[in-house]
Amino acid sequence: MSKKILVIGAGIFGCCIAIELNKVGYEVILLEQNSDIMQRASKLNHNRIHFGFHYPRSVKTAKQSLDGLVSFLLNFKDAIVSDFPNYYMNHIDSNVSSEEYLNFCDEVGISYEFEYPKEYLLNRNNIDLSLKVNEPIFDYDILKSTVMYKLMGVDLRLSTKFDGNVDGYDYIINSSYSNVNKINDMLGAPKLNLKFQDVIVPIFKMKHSPLGLTIMDGPFCSIMPRGNRKNEFLLYHPKYSVISESKQVIDISNENEDFLIDKIYKDSTKFYPFLSDVKRNGCWRTIRALPVNYNDARLSELFINNNHPNFITVLSGKVSTCWKVAYEIKSIIRNGVKWKGEIVV
């Protein structure tokens, strides 16, 4: 008899889990409280497909991102954007030295070239290392349309909040990201040790070919292309893009967005002077859920509680691990739950 499985949350992780379970013949119901799939953190981010360069203080995060890379590229090959120069630079006030950063890259096994971006793109004061890398991004629109196509056969229920009813389901998968603790609490499962951030990502336009610029590893800033959109870019500042943070679930604040965006551009222009001449084009807002830790790790993990062996909680890490998580959950359900606690995918 086919198992009936409820997946809560249709972000990229929930969608991939539902797709993979549906492939093997399970009856899958995918709930999403929004009117469409992938409308929050799956969309409202830097669209970076992590090779690991972003996490010099967490080798595990870098290696897990690489481990999931092949499955991500195979499933979403049409959404990959890679034909642009991408630079990772080290600041003298970084959390890691340039030597430590290079040692990290070599340990993880990610390739790079020593090269600086053109002078008009970067204020080189206090930058002691620049690497040109081949790390790609994804185009959200193509990614979403690919996911929608793959979801055929899944019982997708949009604009539907989880009401706590789990009668008749063999397994329940909580992949609701920023609502993960709310769902766990509804079902009497332990909450994860998370912090929640209200995040703003400014969007700007400039007549320039796509490029990526990231200064590591501290209160600096990063610029990435906005998928395949011509002359559009995303700006993120680790300090000023995070409007508020709490260990309790929070909502997007009512603070003046123009004021917040001004702070981001003002500080980022110290590193990228050309930002003073770009055309601002709005922003993205979302709530981000991150694990509380000391080393900046962003691992994808699964949690199974002794009292709820058929209830799996997903802590979503880097996007490249979405299929890896889906395969692991498929294996758990096929073989039965044999492990309780935390599973690093």
Regions picked out by a protein language model, each given a short descriptive name:
Residues I80-H91, F114-L151, H308-S316:
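Helix-loop-beta segment of a Rossmann-like dinucleotide-binding subdomain
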Residues M38, D170-M216, R226-N231, L275:
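Central helical "cap/lid" subdomain
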Residues K4-I29:
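N-terminal Rossmann-like FAD-binding beta1-loop-alpha1 element of flavoenzymes
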Residues H46-L121, N125-I127:
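Dinucleotide-binding Rossmann-like beta1-alpha1 core, especially the glycine-rich loop
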